[in-house]
Amino acid sequence: MPPKKKSNNTTPIDTVKHKDKRVNIPTEELRDFVKEDEAKPKTILYPRDPSLDPQLVWKGKDEQDAKDLAVPAVPIYIQEKIHPQAVIENVRAEAKKDKPEAQASLFADFNGIKFEDLIDFYQHQQNWSNRMILGDSLLVMTSLAEKEGLKGKVQMVFLDPPYGIKFGSNWQVSTRKRDVKDAKAEDATRQPEQIKAFRDTWRLGIHSYLAYLRDRLVTARELLTETGSCFVQIGDENVHLVRSLMDEVFGAESYVSIINYKKTSGQTAKYLSVTTDYILWYGKNIDQMKYRPLYREKSLEGEGGGMYQFVELPNGERRRLSAEESANQKILPDGSRIYRLGDVTSQRQGRPSGPGSAMFFPVKVDGVEFLPPGARGWSTTENGMQNLSLAGRLVAQGIRLSYVRHLNDFAAFELDNDWNDTAGATDRVYVVQTNQKVIERCLLMTTDPGDLVLDPTCGSGTTAYVAEQWGRRWITIDTSRVALALARTRLMAAKYPYYYLADSPDGVKKDAEVTGKLPPDFKTDGDIKKGFVYKRVPHVTLKSIANNPDIKEGMKREEIDAAISRHADTETLYDQPYEDNKRIRVTGPFTVESLSPHRVLATDEERPATEKAAQKAPGAGQFETMILDNLKKAGVQNTVKEERLKFERLEPYAGEWLHFAGEYTEKGGVSKRVAVCIGPEHGTVGHELIKEAAKEAIKGVGFDLLVVCGFAFDAHANETANQFAADAKKASDKIVAEGQKQYGRLPILLARMNPDLAMGEELLKKTGAGNLFMVFGEPDLKVKKVKDGKITVEINGVDVYDPTTGQIRSSSTDDIACWFIDTNYNGESFFVRHAYFTGADEPYEKLKRALRAEVDEAAWSMLYSTVSSPFDTPEKGKIAVKVINHYGDEVLKVYEMK
């Protein structure tokens, strides 16, 4: 069989383009320009109002309410700039052996701002890109509101706080492990930001939980626009308390609804199994709240049709449906019309009623005269009632007159607060992933395309995914690097339907086709805020029939039905836009950002009063003493059991940045002096700490080794450590790694502390952790020139340092989740121009199927390779490679291409 010919037609790949702007903020590379903001952040005060009544009372609340909520507005730094379309176009170009010209243009306009304005932070507007931010949501939301001017700009907040108040709390510790067991010690979180949240939030159980949640609701409220909504997803353990808390924050008058929805699987309980979770819905200003009703399909056998118990046969006979007919309407004769009876009278509140009033008059049906009962009146005028009678919409029921409402008058029914259709299989990538349909409905009810959506609890990025699908802008926040690693991969590889834009030539044409009306003559601009071209459903109402000018006496039934159809109202189905199946859409440009250095609130002086009152953190001295004791016992381990740095002596050191000093013996009996620096208890080790500790060690008493211990290291940590090494080793005569790791003048060892240390001695005993201090590996990369002057990068694994010999050895690529290349690194920001996912999953499977006619298997396989596709020598002379492991740890390496 001859091979199938490839189509020459290129499938358009699109993204949603937002005309909105965002304020320019610093990148990690340009952080030195905002040192003042980092060192002395402005403190924002959120006033307390203890006079609110009724309100919850919990342990420590009086002390919390005695002071305003104080939160520092710290800078947020851009770590990566990602344009998924550029990655896909690169794959397509590789398959066709074309030059990926589109990629350069896509990144060229990422900022839309000149350099001198780029470093004048917070003063200029640049192109919108969606945002994924690592850090404490309280700090991030405060910074967004106060430093970046987003106060009153967010249309919807979706918050999914932890459900319970127990130890396990279902934190996912790796991108590879989703079978997390609640209250199981080995599944405890392995990330300092989340440990901080665990200790602060759960130390006093529900008391701390409520303090934690109230602060974040207060800051979220400040971000909401007056028409905005806040949704909180919660389980049955705390729904009653959280509703009271939201009454206190938003005001009881701002309560909209409590939505109950079915979970995919029931939660085991001692008595009844729990199959339902809840969504609490509050508006910022209930009188101005944006609301777009959603509808579900009505059917006699299914939902929405239960009240339709009568049938009108083609011969005009009307009767009640039999049980068999209700179960299967297909057995009815063709032309039968199912209906229900409705009221044709209304209350006359504040208006004249009874005999003599405008709506009190006799109506004759089938020779019998009827009057409205009691103080009620007819729902329409005499002419209107005559129209209803001519249309066969009035029927006598004893002494009452009723309105005939056909099943097909409105083939849908409005969504209420009981969502029993949300259970079902989902492709989970995160242990506590929120049901996509739940977020989708919340978003569609309260936002329009182009509106801004915020999720302070990112998880696997479901809110961002849904917002992207429906053309909303999004910001998502999480303390978990694992969560953001999963979310980033999910969004980079996502494929979405291409919906017709109302403000586009194709959209105008589609709308004319659907409505049967001539398209208006106007210039389109592709503005997403004008929405999509939506499906509509006819809605025949009593009012539309009563006021129909075309219904006349003597008309046939078909003529009357046509007149009713012409003047029927329509309802917009906001969840059913028309789709162009010939095009595909991918995620638009977004940035990965973090507080610096992945900052969390740590000291009592810096933490909000609520968290201080809920749980007093142990002193820094106590933490350092515990680390010293464990360092003495455990030493520093690499991935090989026998290779451990054992301290002969280790004691406190009275330095500014150095905490301990001691000695160890290398193989061969050579004694060496070592200095130890301990990173923050609840944060990430950044380049500033490494630099200052190294300077102090060099100026000191001749240390042979510096060990920097931290729970997490930012991506630039290795680059900083390498500045204190010997002369850079050349990978070739043309390529020099900036700061290629050398253990010369002052070897710096980055040791990742087991996060169980942050949980305290009690948990440490419970988990039985063995390797408490592990050497932080550096990726083993090979950059080489290939034919046509192009360059490739190969990742061989992670370099492991043997503390007993001082030698470096490479391990496999198994621990690497993904790696990115900026093939033209300018030193100002990291653009993800190449992306490779070496984990077990294949995230691009859906896009692969959509583009199977254009891109062959070999080109797609490049996305999962440990060797990059060839690329041109960079204009700027540098490339940067970022490697991310399954725990979300990142390392960045920069190469000078000479």
Please give the residue ranges for each predicted region.
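N-terminal auxiliary segments of SAM/dcSAM-dependent transferases
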Residues: E297-D409
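S-adenosyl-L-methionine-dependent nucleic acid methyltransferase catalytic domains
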Residues: M1-E317, V365, L390-R393, Q397-K898
